[in-house]
């Protein structure tokens, strides 16, 4: 496959996201995670229900209020809510009749074998810490060196435990 640049960046005004859905696949050249933003005008919502073959989705509500229809259940949404939806569940979003609703949708496909370690706090526990090369804002800070020693020991204990 194609070699991607080592990072991609785009900027959207979080306080005034573009209306409806903004897909970030192309601007960010995504290959392993789906992400989009939504800004539904008051009283408006998806025009159809949808589900997925494999993709798990997380809806993150940044502002406003509304509902998400999950199967036959209406779930109220407000700023600060995070909702995970299993792939086969039919879903659709709608903003409140008086207030718009904006947020972020993140999607991913389960990969067999993750989390690899029972004690992991992250799902995709494939991080490779470089304990020797600190970011410039931490250089020379002995407290950070001590914190990192503890973190390294915790990570090694989790890996050893399986």
Description of each model-found segment:
Residues 1-33, 118-162:
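A short, N-terminal "cap"/entry segment at the start of jelly-roll beta-barrel domains
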Residues 32, 53-54:
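Short, small/polar residue-rich loop motifs at catalytic or cofactor-binding pockets
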Residues 29, 67, 87-114:
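Ligand-binding loop in jelly-roll beta-barrel domains
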Residues 19-23, 36-52:
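Conserved short histidine dyad/triad with adjacent acidic residue
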Residues 31, 69-73:
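Short strand-coil-strand connectors
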Residues 54-56, 60-66:
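Glycine- and acidic-residue-biased ligand/ion/polar-headgroup-sensing regions
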Residues 72-88:
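Short acidic-glycine-tyrosine-enriched beta hairpin
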């Amino acid at each position: 496959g194609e070699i991607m640049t080592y990072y991609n960046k785009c900027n959207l005004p979080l306080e005034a996201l573009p209306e409806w859905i903004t897909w970030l696949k192309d601007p960010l050249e995504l290959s392993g995670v789906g992400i989009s933003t939504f800004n539904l005008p008051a009283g408006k919502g998806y025009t159809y229900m949808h589900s997925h073959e494999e993709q798990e989705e997380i809806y993150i509500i940044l502002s406003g209020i509304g509902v998400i229809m999950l199967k036959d259940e209406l779930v109220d949404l407000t700023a600060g809510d995070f909702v995970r939806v299993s792939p086969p569940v039919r879903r659709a979003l709608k903003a409140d009749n008086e207030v718009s609703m904006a947020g972020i949708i993140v999607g991913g496909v389960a990969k067999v074998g993750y989390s690899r370690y029972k004690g992991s706090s992250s799902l995709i526990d494939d991080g490779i810490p470089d304990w020797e090369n600190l970011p410039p804002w931490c250089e020379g800070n002995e407290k950070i060196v001590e914190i990192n020693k503890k973190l390294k020991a915790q990570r090694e204990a989790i890996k050893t435990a399986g």
